[in-house]
């Protein structure tokens, strides 16, 4: 019998990528990084083996710099996993969104661009129904776009 919570919510494990490694930032501080693994594909496969039905990736380099540096890891993960993979972090243009959706990602998460260019989000959502998520961060009770 399935646990009751499975009927009401989906728990999605996340991997934060920084310079190709799996990390965790302390309260979003890039100066306080804990490196968990240098092998993102192995980490992702571990979540799948533990029963994950979806995986959430965050490109921290993309989020901070606006430039992707973890595409190799992202592509390798999407290729290796049997479950859907979604990604957020640094997706700030239609071209980048299309590139990510074409590389095998199931969904992409738009943050800053959703606040700065909402018409882009609408256009992408029309072209890719069900594949665009808007993620809004908050800090001290206010929207924190970056």
Regions found by a protein language model. Give the residues of each.
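Catalytic cores of alpha/beta
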Residues: 81, 85-107
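Glycine-rich, proline-tolerant flexible connector loops at the mouths of alpha/beta enzymes
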Residues: 54-72, 112
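Alpha-helix-loop-beta-strand connector modules within alpha/beta enzyme cores
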Residues: 65-88, 121-137
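Non-catalytic positions within long, well-ordered alpha-helices that form the structural scaffold/packing
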Residues: 48-51, 101-102
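Conserved anion-binding
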Residues: 22-31, 98-101, 105-146
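Hydrophobic faces of well-ordered beta-strands that scaffold small-molecule active sites
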Residues: 10-15, 55-57, 85-89, 108-110, ...
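Short, acidic/polar
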Residues: 36-47, 92-98
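N-terminal amphipathic alpha-helix/helix-capping segment at the start of soluble metabolic enzymes
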Residues: 4-27, 139
